[in-house]
Amino acid sequence: MKCISLKQPYAEMLAVGKKIIECRKWCTKFRGDFLIHASKNVDIKSCNYYNIDENSIIKGAIIGKANLYDVKKYLNYKDFLLDANKHLSIGIPDDKTIYVFLIKDAAKLEQMIPYKGKLGFFDVNLY
């Protein structure tokens, strides 16, 4: 199964369905179900902004699953701002073109699975 790694707290917010758009600098042709991996790296500014204790969140593990059903492209900063309540990013993108992965059917796993993350979508065989 495909998997994508996100920094915390964004991995958690995606897994519980609060975050329904994932912004990336690259496009993908992949569509379908995927696993959500929480990176060992934490975005401290975002944790502070969302009042999340960085020590209370899972790191370095697969924590959820979701479905990527479409990809669209932001051509300017205005597009990015209009969807702020969906991607929950607090930073300003440094690229003029941002690809946004539209996500649905997110769910946390009952038990986390320790796993080393990688860049981009990567294959995971849990069996």
Model-found features: residue ranges?
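Structured alpha/beta reader/binder surfaces that contact nucleic acids or chromatin modification marks
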Residues: 1-127
